């Protein structure tokens, strides 16, 4: 469900409380971005962003969601985040943009971006039976139903699958399915569908979810660990409103490790939204 007016008000409120933080491209207040951690020539998440001293990325088994996220292609470092209509996003809070085009529809927003990355991973793995997301009313929307030619028919708050077209597991139809999910699922339904996990166990693919109408969602793109202390750091990515490409966020408050985030605070302060440390969720 889309609530552009409410989200706009939320956006204004967040930034009015950040009057001392100037958002500039590839930079922050409270210390510049740690250039030693950024390789502007890197064209994947792993190659673009290095770990801070004494940290190393946690293991990523071949074929895992972690490995998939690390290998996601990035746009050239000098390119902007694009909105769904082709305009540049004028708030620069990123150190990388995932090279994954979005459709010319104001649909793929924050929660949708997290769902898309997970769905894209499962689609590449051909694990079609695992691609399913719940609508806000709690009803499951399985990709295999859509691919088999069934379409949702609504009767009040109830939705049923009705055979309409021929079977098609092609990528365009897969994107049509995701458009349906984006329309009827969101931060609230994700918070009901996923399980909460302790931040000490944070891993790539987890989501910080603040459920609501509107709420917000960011996805954990990678995690590194200090073998001596056990301390973990993580990278975050987001979609936003209006719909935009998925961007890897900078950390405006911890310049020495920017763009990594630490788990030592109760509040996870991203540039455009604050989460609490107990709002971490995981796909089951």
Please place each PLM-identified region on the residue numbering.
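Extracytoplasmic/periplasmic, Sec-exported soluble proteins
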Residues: 57, 102-110, 197-200, 212
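Bacterial Sec-dependent N-terminal signal peptides
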Residues: 1-26
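Low-complexity, Gly/Ser/Thr/Pro-rich intrinsically disordered linker/tail segments
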Residues: 232-284
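...with weaker cross-activation on analogous glycine-rich loops/strands in unrelated enzymes
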Residues: 171-228
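Extracellular structured ligand-interaction cores
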Residues: 107, 111, 205, 215-218, ...
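Extracellular-facing segments of soluble proteins and assemblies that are Gly/Ser/Thr-biased and enriched
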Residues: 103-195
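Cationic-aromatic interfacial patches
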Residues: 20-101, 108
């Amino acid at each position: 469900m889309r609530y552009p007016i409410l989200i706009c008000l939320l956006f204004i409120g967040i930034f009015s409380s950040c009057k001392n933080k100037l958002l500039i491209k590839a930079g922050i207040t409270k210390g510049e971005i740690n250039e030693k951690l950024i390789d502007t020539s890197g064209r994947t998440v792993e190659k673009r962003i290095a770990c801070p001293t004494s940290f190393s990325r946690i293991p990523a088994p071949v074929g895992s969601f972690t490995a998939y996220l690390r290998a996601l292609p990035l746009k050239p470092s000098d390119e902007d985040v694009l909105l769904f209509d082709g305009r540049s996003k004028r708030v620069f809070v990123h150190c990388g943009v995932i090279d994954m085009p979005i459709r010319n529809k104001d649909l793929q927003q924050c929660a949708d971006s997290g769902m898309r990355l997970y769905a894209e991973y499962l689609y590449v793995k051909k694990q079609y039976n695992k691609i399913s997301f719940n609508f806000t009313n709690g009803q499951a929307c399985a990709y295999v139903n859509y691919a088999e030619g069934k379409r949702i028919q609504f009767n009040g708050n109830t939705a049923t699958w009705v055979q309409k077209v021929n079977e098609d597991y092609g990528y365009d139809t897969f994107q049509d399915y995701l458009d349906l999910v984006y329309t009827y699922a969101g931060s609230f339904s994700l918070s009901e569908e996923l399980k909460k996990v302790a931040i000490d166990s944070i891993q790539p693919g987890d989501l910080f979810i603040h459920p609501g109408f509107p709420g917000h969602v960011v996805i954990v793109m990678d995690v590194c660990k200090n073998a001596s202390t056990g301390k973990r750091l993580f990278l975050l990515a987001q979609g936003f409103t209006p719909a935009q490409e998925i961007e890897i966020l900078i950390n405006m408050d911890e310049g020495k490790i920017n763009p990594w985030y630490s788990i030592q605070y109760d509040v996870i302060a991203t540039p455009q939204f604050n989460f609490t440390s107990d709002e971490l969720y995981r796909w089951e």
